[in-house]
Amino acid sequence: MTVKTEAAKGTLTYSRMRGMVAILIAFMKQRRMGLNDFIQKIANNSYACKHPEVQSILKISQPQEPELMNANPSPPPSPSQQINLGPSSNPHAKPSDFHFLKVIGKGSFGKVLLARHKAEEVFYAVKVLQKKAILKKKEEKHIMSERNVLLKNVKHPFLVGLHFSFQTADKLYFVLDYINGGELFYHLQRERCFLEPRARFYAAEIASALGYLHSLNIVYRDLKPENILLDSQGHIVLTDFGLCKENIEHNSTTSTFCGTPEYLAPEVLHKQPYDRTVDWWCLGAVLYEMLYGLPPFYSRNTAEMYDNILNKPLQLKPNITNSARHLLEGLLQKDRMKRLGAKDDFMEIKSHVFFSLINWDDLINKKITPPFNPNVSGPNDLRHFDPEFTEEPVPNSIGKSPDSILVTASVKEAAETFLGFSYAPPTDSFL
């Protein structure tokens, strides 16, 4: 017996129909194991995927926008384009491995949650991002860049470490070091400004982290108090690498307009090519804020603030030392070619007289006692997180794979876009 269908759909024989029925019966038996595994089996059967009945049952549909419609059927997907809705090949990396306890941060594409690994009894900060939101804003390159940068940061004491990353059909998960001493921004808000020794200590650890990134040809581009955390002992931890630019060598430049308004360097505002020295401008802006309570050139009117950054001379009040004044003048030099760090990068910062009291070997080995201790009692101590976050309920969807998700064209696009996102550490690392 042969059933004739449209020519474009091919010929459906009795044996092939039996094969499809067997797949559907298997689906019913495996329902409790989750839809994702079944979908993966279907997706690997290119003939079954093209059949209209299978498409109808699984809701695998083409985009409905008129400009995307194509009368000709698409060719079978290549192996690299197959729908991959499994969370990860790493057995440690799936949502159900965690107890998600509290929301501790929010961003443009998702939330950061305090989570405890069920088997390891270890606390992590898990950054959960919505694929749909990332694709809508066309930020997928920045997300993958953030993952790549995180993989390189594992061994630096002042950069947040990535333990593993994985994905479900609709979400990306970064499993990161849990840092609960609070954002530098939070502490600045409470105390308004810091005494110079404390500001020096933080600036030195920040500079060390930036210098390490530069040694990897990475420009950070978004240094600000919100991205600087304190760990439980009071050391700096730099986080959020979404705006990092890779492959920027010493004499290389880039031109993407990005950053946070208060901390943008003049060359970025001018939309001119810029280099690593944008990070030293930002360090100057953060140091200024630590000493004075507001960023340099600040105005509530953004246009006026931009004009100040471009044209207004730097004004320094007399309540800082000459070495601090000299450092700020060097870092906040409007001409990037004359800026401190333009010639020898981190070595210029490191050798500045303002840091003469810093033993850099002791600093990198955390042998210098921080000037402030957050005094957290343990992982569950959330006193340094904004209650706006911690009082928000944890979404139920965070901790499980979405068994009932429909495999639409957008899900297919997301699966293809983020192929290779999942990461598991070597067996002798972390887990």
From Swiss-Prot:
Serine/threonine-protein kinase which is involved in the regulation of a wide variety of ion channels, membrane transporters, cellular enzymes, transcription factors, neuronal excitability, cell growth, proliferation, survival, migration and apoptosis. Plays an important role in cellular stress response. It comes from Macaca fascicularis. One of its GO terms (biological process) is apoptotic process. Its EC number is 2.7.11.1. The active site is at 222 (proton acceptor). Homodimer; disulfide-linked. Forms a trimeric complex with FBXW7 and NOTCH1. Interacts with MAPK3/ERK1, MAPK1/ERK2, MAP2K1/MEK1, MAP2K2/MEK2, NEDD4, NEDD4L, MAPT/TAU, MAPK7, CREB1, SLC9A3R2/NHERF2 and KCNJ1/ROMK1. Associates with the mammalian target of rapamycin complex 2 (mTORC2) via an interaction with MAPKAP1/SIN1. Residues 98-355 form the Protein kinase domain. One of its GO terms (molecular function) is protein serine/threonine kinase activity. The gene is SGK1. CDD domains: STKc_SGK1. InterPro entries: AGC-kinase_C, Kinase-like_dom_sf, Pkinase_C, Prot_kinase_dom, Protein_kinase_ATP_BS, Ser/Thr_kinase_AS. A motif (Nuclear localization signal) lies at residues 131-141. Two specific sites, one in the kinase domain (Thr-256) and the other in the C-terminal regulatory region (Ser-422), need to be phosphorylated for its full activation. Phosphorylation at Ser-397 and Ser-401 are also essential for its activity. Activated by WNK1, WNK2, WNK3 and WNK4; which promote phosphorylation by mTORC2. The lineage of its organism: Eukaryota, Metazoa, Chordata, Craniata, Vertebrata. GO terms for cellular component: endoplasmic reticulum membrane; mitochondrion; nucleus; plasma membrane. Residues 66-92 are annotated as: Disordered. This is Serine/threonine-protein kinase Sgk1. Residues 356-431 form the AGC-kinase C-terminal domain. Belongs to the protein kinase superfamily. AGC Ser/Thr protein kinase family. SMART domains: S_TK_X, S_TKc. It is found in: Cytoplasm; Nucleus; Endoplasmic reticulum membrane; Cell membrane. Regulated by phosphorylation. Activated by phosphorylation on Ser-422 by mTORC2, transforming it into a substrate for PDPK1 which phosphorylates it on Thr-256. Phosphorylation on Ser-397 and Ser-401 are also essential for its activity. Phosphorylation on Ser-78 by MAPK7 is required for growth factor-induced cell cycle progression. Ubiquitinated by NEDD4L; which promotes proteasomal degradation. Ubiquitinated by SYVN1 at the endoplasmic reticulum; which promotes rapid proteasomal degradation and maintains a high turnover rate in resting cells. ATP binds at residues 104-112, 127.
